[in-house]
Amino acid sequence: MKLHELSDNPGATKKRKRVGRGPGSGTGKMGGRGIKGQKSRSGVAINAYEGGQMPLYQRLPKRGFNKPNRKKFAVVNLGLIQKFIDAGKLDGKADITEDALVASGLVRRKLDGVRVLAKGDVSGKLNITVTGASKAAIDAVSAAGGALTVSAPAAAE
């Protein structure tokens, strides 16, 4: 057997249908597209339609939900607070409150409060009062001789 002697099984291939080539062809004029409408126009694809195969967005399981009244905190790292103190934008000797952080420009908006995280180092004794803080941040400030107080968020009016 040689390569040029190989052929497909009978019925394995179909001839391509030439569409829109006159009434004698059987698929002339409309070319199997019907009359008007989005599907009869060229260049139109229906989004997420996969040719009848179950679409990806339906194959994946539904999972989780978004809490409608979730609290959003402005996040600040200890290293940034220290950087602002070193630059003279924040007073390290006075109590550092959420309003002081906003006034210095470190936090743009308080949102539902400010949360302090432990990234960076603290080189002095700081007294910080905020709505939230990580355990590592509280430990880092107290190790430097300061105090990080977590106050309850103000009730919405």
Curated annotation (Swiss-Prot):
GO annotations of cellular component type: large ribosomal subunit
InterPro entries: Ribosomal_uL15 (IPR030878), Ribosomal_uL15/eL18 (IPR021131), Ribosomal_uL15/eL18_sf (IPR036227), Ribosomal_uL15_bac-type (IPR005749), Ribosomal_uL15_CS (IPR001196)
Disordered, as annotated region: 1-41
Keyword Protein biosynthesis on entry: no
Molecular function as annotated in GO: rRNA binding; structural constituent of ribosome
Biased composition (Gly residues): 21-35
Keyword Transmembrane helix attributed: no
Entry keyword set: Ribonucleoprotein, Ribosomal protein, RNA-binding, rRNA-binding
GO biological process, one term: translation
Quaternary organization: Part of the 50S ribosomal subunit.
Family: Belongs to the universal ribosomal protein uL15 family.
Function: Binds to the 23S rRNA.
Entry protein name: Large ribosomal subunit protein uL15
Organism of this sequence: Jannaschia sp. (strain CCS1)
Phylogenetic lineage: Bacteria, Pseudomonadati, Pseudomonadota, Alphaproteobacteria, Rhodobacterales
Originating gene: rplO
